[in-house]
């Protein structure tokens, strides 16, 4: 029994060992099969790669070139975007902002124009009627009403104003002119040269100056008021002027009788003319020399035959003014009720002298009054062109302060230096 059990156990153990050995062999076979399959797969993949390399030998170079090309294209696109941004967002378009015509086209968007409604109405009125004179008058009236409204000035109810400050400025100007005229006898030399170079008739000898008095008083302006001129449709300043002074000019000449032979007789003549009083109402206004009203007024004056003799003498200056491009001018005239008083002294003859002949005095006075009326008395007026008031570098001035030489003083045994400059005060407390 025991032997049989031993044999059975031995058989069982051998079977189990056989099963284990069989299982291990099976596992080893599976592992070997898997390794073989893996090797076959690797060999298959290697063969495929070798075939691909053989069929496409330049594939790597193509991939490398496509990357470089993409990089270059990307850089170019970035540069193009930067250029477009700088051109359209940083810098302005020159063609859209710089006007082709340097005239009014470039200033239309810069200058602020007010009263657009009035301008539109004026333009519509011009298209309907085409009357430039009416357009100018309407525009001038609108400007005048705007000026009076913004300056709070009522031409009908505003009180007259004194011109004390203006009198001081005029007095300073006249005083400076007198000083310059009397400096080195400038006025004498100027008048003497004028009389010497003047064309005289054959019966008048050389004219010599005997007396010159430019006065020492000043005109007084007062009672200034602004009025609306009905004739020229503009604002005018009415100013009362009063001058009580003595302005004298004395000359001496000879009347020559050249018949029947030259210098048959000689008659000495001495004249002294003095203006002792002038008063009147002065009308002053600022105008544009290209105004239509002014041109029409000049044409009317010429048609009326005003000052034919004087017009020929003044034609050169008138032509010069007509050739100008216009500008601001000061227009002034005096009312017909002015007051002008003269004192005329005459002395005729060599031995038997005739003194203060009334006929000669009235003749000279009438000639002077006629000369004044034809130039300055309404409806005639004088136009004085004003210089440009725009600030310029060439007109800029600056006071120059010059230092005087240094002077030394001794006080209580100590020396002190003092430097003085014009317009400064020297400190005396050393």
From Swiss-Prot:
The SMP-LTD domain is a barrel-like domain that can bind various types of glycerophospholipids in its interior and mediate their transfer between two adjacent bilayers. Keywords: Endoplasmic reticulum, Lipid transport, Lipid-binding, Membrane, Transmembrane, Transmembrane helix, Transport. Residues 92-430 are cytoplasmic. Homodimer. Component of the ER-mitochondria encounter structure (ERMES) or MDM complex, composed of MMM1, MDM10, MDM12 and MDM34. A MMM1 homodimer associates with one molecule of MDM12 on each side in a pairwise head-to-tail manner, and the SMP-LTD domains of MMM1 and MDM12 generate a continuous hydrophobic tunnel for phospholipid trafficking. InterPro entries: Mmm1, MMM1_dom, SMP_LBD. Residues 1-70 are lumenal. Residues 317-326 have a biased composition (Acidic residues). This is Maintenance of mitochondrial morphology protein 1. The keyword Electron transport does not apply. It is a single-pass type I membrane protein. Belongs to the MMM1 family. GO terms for molecular function: lipid binding. GO terms for biological process: mitochondrial genome maintenance; mitochondrion-endoplasmic reticulum membrane tethering; phospholipid transport; protein insertion into mitochondrial outer membrane. It is found in: Endoplasmic reticulum membrane. Residues 159-387 form the SMP-LTD domain. The gene is MMM1. The chain crosses the membrane at residues 71-91. It comes from Candida dubliniensis (strain CD36 / ATCC MYA-646 / CBS 7987 / NCPF 3949 / NRRL Y-17841). GO terms for cellular component: endoplasmic reticulum membrane; ERMES complex. Residues 305-326 are annotated as: Disordered.
């Amino acid at each position: 029994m025991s032997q049989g059990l031993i044999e059975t156990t031995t058989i069982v153990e051998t079977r189990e060992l056989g099963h284990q050995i069989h299982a291990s062999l099976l596992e080893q076979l599976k592992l070997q099969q898997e390794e073989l399959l893996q090797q076959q797969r690797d060999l298959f993949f290697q063969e495929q790669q070798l075939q691909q390399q053989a069929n496409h030998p330049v594939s790597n170079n193509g991939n490398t070139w496509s990357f470089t090309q993409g990089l270059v294209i990307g850089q170019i696109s970035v540069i193009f975007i930067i250029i477009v941004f700088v051109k359209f967002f940083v810098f302005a378009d020159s063609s859209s902002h710089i006007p082709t015509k340097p005239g009014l086209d470039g200033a239309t968007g810069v200058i602020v124009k007010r009263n657009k409604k009035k301008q539109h109405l004026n333009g519509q009125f011009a298209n309907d009627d085409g009357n430039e004179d009416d357009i100018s008058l309407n525009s001038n009236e609108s400007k005048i009403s705007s000026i009076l409204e913004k300056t709070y000035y009522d031409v009908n109810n505003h009180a007259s104003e004194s011109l004390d400050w203006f009198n001081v400025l005029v007095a300073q100007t006249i005083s400076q002119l007198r000083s310059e005229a009397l400096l080195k006898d400038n006025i004498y030399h100027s008048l003497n040269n004028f009389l010497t170079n003047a064309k005289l008739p054959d019966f008048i000898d050389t004219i010599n100056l005997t007396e010159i008095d430019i006065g020492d008083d000043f005109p007084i302006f007062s009672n200034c008021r602004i009025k609306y001129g009905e004739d020229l449709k503009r604002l005018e300043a009415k100013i009362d002027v009063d001058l009580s002074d003595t302005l004298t000019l004395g000359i001496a000449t000879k009347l020559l009788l050249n018949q029947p032979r030259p210098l048959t007789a000689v008659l000495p003549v001495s004249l002294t003319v003095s203006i002792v009083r002038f008063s009147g109402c002065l009308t002053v206004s600022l105008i544009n020399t290209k105004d239509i009203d002014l041109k029409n007024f000049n044409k009317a004056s010429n048609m009326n035959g005003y000052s034919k003799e004087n017009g020929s003498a003044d034609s050169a200056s008138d032509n010069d003014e007509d050739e100008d491009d216009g500008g601001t001018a000061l227009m002034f005239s005096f009312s017909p009720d002015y007051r002008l008083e003269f004192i005329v002294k005459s002395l005729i003859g060599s031995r038997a002298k005739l003194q203060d002949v009334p006929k000669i005095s009235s003749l000279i006075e009438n000639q002077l009054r006629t000369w004044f009326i034809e130039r300055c008395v309404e409806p005639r007026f004088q136009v004085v062109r004003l210089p440009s008031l725009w600030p310029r570098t060439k007109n800029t001035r600056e006071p120059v302060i010059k230092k005087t030489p240094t002077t030394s003083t001794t006080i209580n045994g100590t020396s002190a230096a003092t430097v003085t400059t014009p317009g400064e005060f020297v400190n005396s407390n050393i």
